[in-house]
Each structure stands twice: as structure tokens, then as C-alpha cells.
Amino acid sequence: MKNNTIRNVVATGIGAALFVVIGMINIPTPVPNTSIQLQYPLQALFSVIFGPIVGFLMGFIGHAIKDAMSGGGLWWFWIAGSGVFGLLVGFFRKFFRVEEGKFEVKDIIRFNLIQFGANAIAWLIGPIGDVIVSGEPVNKVIAQSIVAILVNSATVAVIGTVLLTAYARTRTRAGSLKKD
């Protein structure tokens, strides 16, 4: 897909706004300050469609605004984690053929392996930063990290797969149009 700066700027703005709005829906987990987040499947979709820069900025800007609006302060390492998730998924966008109208079983498996790896890397950033900079207890942040990796991976696996499958179906497959 051709790089289109205006398109990417608009996608970043819309993506960050949706990240904030959807991020206001918090489904609590038993671990303090950790919840099931529904914005990451959408971030994965945007990362695959628009690439790593849009994916990073959507997560970074959206998470920063969400934290600022919540009144609990800005947790920069966790904000960075959101950006890194979008960046990593976006780096692998060329492995997917959603723009060609294809998101088949092998694509779904590949997507979910990539998003799980991206979640694992992204949600180690926050805890490491919390321990080193903020002096947070190691046991607490390890629990938060494990829960974040698992629940975010699960939501992206289910909802992200549905979103990418639906998006691929809106694209015209190459060679699918025939002259009558």
C-alpha cells in the first residue's frame, strides 16, 4: 500500500481518539490497577492497515490522554508499552494480506503469534519501569504484567481476529472481478 501522510495523520488522530473512548471501558481483574482493555484489538487492526508509526502513535497518544483524563497521573512506562504493542504489530503488517481481501487460517495463526509476542514485550516495559524508576514492589508488577499479557492477548486474539477478518472481507480480492 502506498504511504500516504495525510491518511496516516488522520488514522492516528481517529485511532488515538477511539483508543481513549474504548479505553474508558474497564473490566476489572483480580489484580490491582489491571483490567481487561478492549482498545488493543482496534490498535492491532490499525497497526496492520496503516503500519507501525500509526500503531505506535495511536497507542502512545491514546494511552497518555486516557491516563490524563483518569486523574491517576501519567504512567509513562505503561504508556510506552501501548505504543510498543502497536509498533511491533505494525512491523509485521507485510505478512498479512488483508488489503488483498485475504485473512485465512494461516494468517490468523500468524497474526495471533505475532500479537502474543508483541503483548509479551510491551507489557514487560511498564513493570520494569515501575520497579526501576518508581520503586514498585516486584511481586505486584509481575502479577500486573502477567495479567496484562494474558488478557490483552486474549482480547486481541478474539476481537482483533474478528476485526481483521471483517476488514479483509471488505476488500476486493485480486482477480475476483470478471468482465461479462
Swiss-Prot record:
Single GO cellular component term: plasma membrane
Similarity comment: family membership: Belongs to the UPF0397 family.
Cited Gene3D superfamilies: 1.10.1760.20
Keyword Isomerase attributed: no
Protein name in the entry: UPF0397 protein SSA_0592
Spans through the membrane: 9-29, 45-65, 72-92, 113-133, 146-166
InterPro entries for this protein: ECF_substrate-spec-like, UPF0397
Ribonucleoprotein listed as a keyword: no
Membrane topology: Multi-pass membrane protein
Subcellular location: Cell membrane
Primary localization: membrane
Keywords, comma-separated and alphabetical: Cell membrane, Membrane, Transmembrane, Transmembrane helix
